[in-house]
């Protein structure tokens, strides 16, 4: 059937609630337009593809089961075509009136040709049906509609009148393979079978279609419509909140939600795990409703993170908020949304855990060890702290995540570690606090890390600097010193790049003078306290002393 016949038949189409919102983007629009431009130039018949419909009102209204992205795009394209023809006052020999094109594809005597999914309807009606020029999007799919209209309008405005007419006719003559079915269960099942066509669906979109289909299968006949409406309402709310997500996308949040609420917790891997838990539910309709309700609440609650003003949340963001932390935050927001002090305690706990995990950097699976704590967490941060502490130090974790492993990592080689600067700034803050200052008041140009005992302990003439821990039998550091002391926290210092360059390989007395003259960083000024008995030397004894002091600070700062 030609596209022109399909639309002149008087059919009206609607997109059922289990369909995804409009998701095509510039790549798909460009291919759509290029196919029309190239096809009309060589004279081949354009295939519009398959269109799978469900008969809702015989001969009048049809649900689109497969092909809704293409139909929506065709109608947006025709709206742009109508606008360009009118703007340029073109007359086409093949078109008696541009109004005919508008009636066929947009609206005819009160009959709107396409009713999109509820979340897209306000935008589509305003921009396409009523041809408004401005609309403020509240979801990614609405923004896609806005951008599609702008794209086609811009591209068509560049074309000559003859090319426009040829493209229009080529689109109208495109062949569409039409299949019509009756019955919602059959239609929903066909949607499941067609769901891998076209642009790949997100997991959230696939989940929506799966849940909608289950409503048809398991709801009592009298409850089908109301259950579908409730589910559609939840997903409409979810999609309306997508633009408010920060740092993560919809599938990330779905994954973190599953960590928080599914029985397998951090064992969740993909949608098959959701389906498996659904299959095991006695009341499947209620299970879907409960899951979707909680998922909607998670999308609503996570919006609060946009406006969170909390130093530990900021640090979590700096650590790229590990997935396990999001799961606890999702549950925390459920129980403590209106309890800022409790949320502050949760952020503090999660920052400590995230820091320790990042510092240790073990390949051992950490998230699975958090499954029991996330299952039992109902907002009590004190209990959660005890649960996590116990998990980190139980027999299954003691070799990977325990307090002792954390201490060993702090005592080891930290040079080049992504958290080294954070550790030294936190240490600086602890030195400033008794004096009533904060690190926010300090700015260092080209921040760098200084090896107090230099990496190359030679003077400008190439002679060994014996003020450092040189093995005099080889005139350089011993392997033991290099492995245990050179890159440990006791030998590392925050410094500006310019100061670092000026003192790099100087004798220790010159370095100490430079540190003492620095009135900006207390960690530089306190170096003298570690060498009061031997002010001309910086060796393993002094490094150990400073290392132990900083490590003890860290053990207290990140104690769980």
What are these regions (language model features)?
Residues 1-264, 505-559:
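Glycine- and hydrophobic-rich flexible loops that cap the catalytic core of alpha/beta enzyme folds
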Residues 63-70, 168-171, 179-186, 317-322, ...:
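Secondary-structure capping and boundary motifs in well-ordered enzyme cores
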Residues 191-193, 203-208, 274, 340-351, ...:
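Composition- and surface-driven signal marking solvent-exposed, interaction-prone regions
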Residues 35-41, 45-60, 96, 379-523:
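Betabetaalpha-Me/HNH-type nuclease active-site subdomain
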Residues 5-7, 164-171, 304-307, 380, ...:
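Short, conserved catalytic or adaptor-binding loops enriched in Gly and charged residues
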Residues 42-43, 84-87, 197-201, 335-341, ...:
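Secondary-structure transition/capping motifs at alpha-helix termini
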Residues 204-207, 214-426, 529, 533-534:
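A cross-family structural signal marking well-folded subdomains
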Residues 191, 330, 347, 351, ...:
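Generic hydrophobic alpha-helical scaffold/packing signal
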């Amino acid at each position: 059937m030609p596209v022109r016949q399909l639309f002149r038949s008087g059919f009206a189409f609607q997109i059922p609630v289990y369909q995804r919102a409009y998701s095509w983007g510039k790549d798909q629009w460009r291919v759509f337009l290029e196919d029309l431009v190239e096809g009309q130039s060589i004279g081949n018949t354009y295939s519009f593809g398959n269109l799978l419909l469900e008969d809702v009102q015989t001969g009048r209204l049809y649900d689109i089961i497969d092909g809704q992205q293409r139909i929506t795009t065709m109608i947006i394209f025709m709206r742009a075509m109508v606008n360009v023809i009118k703007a340029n006052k073109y007359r086409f020999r093949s078109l008696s009136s541009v109004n005919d094109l508008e009636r066929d594809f947009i609206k005819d005597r009160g009959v709107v040709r396409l009713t999109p999914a509820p979340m897209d309807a306000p935008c589509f009606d305003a921009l396409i049906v009523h041809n408004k020029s401005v609309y403020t999007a509240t979801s990614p799919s609405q923004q896609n509609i806005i951008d599609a209209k702008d794209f086609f309008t811009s591209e068509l405005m560049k074309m000559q009148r003859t090319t426009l007419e040829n493209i229009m006719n080529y689109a109208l003559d495109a062949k569409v393979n039409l299949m019509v079915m009756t019955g919602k269960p059959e239609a929903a099942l066909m949607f499941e079978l067609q769901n891998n066509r076209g642009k790949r669906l997100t997991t959230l979109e696939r989940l929506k279609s799966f849940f909608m289909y289950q409503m048809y299968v398991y709801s009592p006949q009298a409850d089908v419509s109301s259950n579908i409406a409730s589910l559609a309402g939840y997903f409409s709310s979810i999609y309306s909140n997508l633009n408010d997500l920060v740092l993560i996308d919809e599938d990330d949040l779905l994954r973190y939600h599953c960590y928080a609420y599914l029985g397998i917790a951090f064992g969740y891997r993909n949608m098959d795990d959701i389906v498996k838990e659904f299959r095991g539910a006695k009341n499947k309709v209620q299970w879907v409703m409960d899951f979707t309700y909680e998922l909607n609440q998670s999308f609503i609650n996570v919006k609060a993170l946009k406006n969170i003003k909390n130093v530990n949340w900021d640090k979590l963001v700096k650590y790229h908020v590990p997935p396990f932390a999001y799961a606890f935050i999702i549950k925390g927001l459920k129980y403590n949304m209106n309890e800022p002090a409790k949320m502050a305690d949760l952020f503090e706990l999660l920052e400590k855990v995230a820091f320790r995990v990042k510092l240790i950097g073990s390949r051992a699976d950490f998230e699975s060890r958090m499954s029991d704590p996330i299952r039992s967490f109902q907002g009590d941060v004190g209990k959660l702290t005890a649960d996590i502490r116990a998990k980190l130090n139980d027999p299954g974790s003691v070799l990977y995540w325990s307090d002792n492993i954390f201490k060993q990592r702090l005592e080891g080689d930290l040079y080049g570690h992504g958290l080294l600067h954070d550790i030294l700034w936190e240490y600086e803050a602890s030195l400033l606090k008794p004096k009533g200052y904060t690190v926010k008041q300090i700015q260092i140009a080209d921040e760098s890390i200084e090896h107090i005992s230099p990496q190359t302990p030679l003077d400008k003439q190439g002679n060994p600097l014996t003020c450092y821990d040189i093995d005099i039998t080889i005139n350089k550091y011993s392997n033991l010193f290099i492995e245990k002391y050179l890159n440990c926290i006791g030998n590392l210092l925050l410094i500006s790049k310019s100061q670092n360059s000026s003192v790099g390989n100087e004798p220790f007395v010159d370095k100490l003078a430079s540190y003492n003259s620095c009135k900006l960083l207390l960690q530089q000024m306190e170096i003298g306290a570690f060498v009061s008995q031997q002010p001309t030397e910086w060796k393993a004894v002094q490094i150990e002393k400073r290392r132990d002091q900083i490590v003890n600070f860290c053990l207290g700062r990140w104690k769980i």
